[in-house]
Amino acid sequence: MELTTSHIQFIKEHATDDLTRLLLSAAKYPGMDIPFLVDQIAVRRQIREKLPSWFENGQLVFPAKIAAEQCSSEQTAAYKQELIGESWTICDLTGGLGIDSYFLSRKAKQLTYIERFPVYCEAAKHNFSVLEANNITIINADAAQVVDTLPAVSYTHLT
């Protein structure tokens, strides 16, 4: 799951458009996945205040509107980051959009992101790469089924 240059441009050009009309006019944009792009625009509208730095980064992709609704705000994630140690290894059992994982990884030594939905993992892989969060391992699994197989960590995050 990635945004191409044409996707990014489309999102910028149509950021304030009526999304229902945009969906209904999908035939005007051959080769563009209009439902996907409309979802990206809708999520960006949702996160403008909640995740300002992610809103500003046009290369980030969002797997689902509900992920944006359920995620921590940047302010909350930054607070959580203050509570951990620099040498810590962390496991985020409910990866979701990856906001907490990203902020915690900026201070932690290593972070494991676990998420059961493949599309969330694809988006997280892309976003963490864009954000240069290179100390995150992504596992696509139900946390309850893999938690006993994971190595010991300093902190297990579950929200």
Predicted regions and their residues:
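Conserved SAM-binding loop of SAM-dependent methyltransferases across substrates and taxa
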Residues: 97-108
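Conserved Rossmann-like nucleotide-cofactor binding loop
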Residues: 119
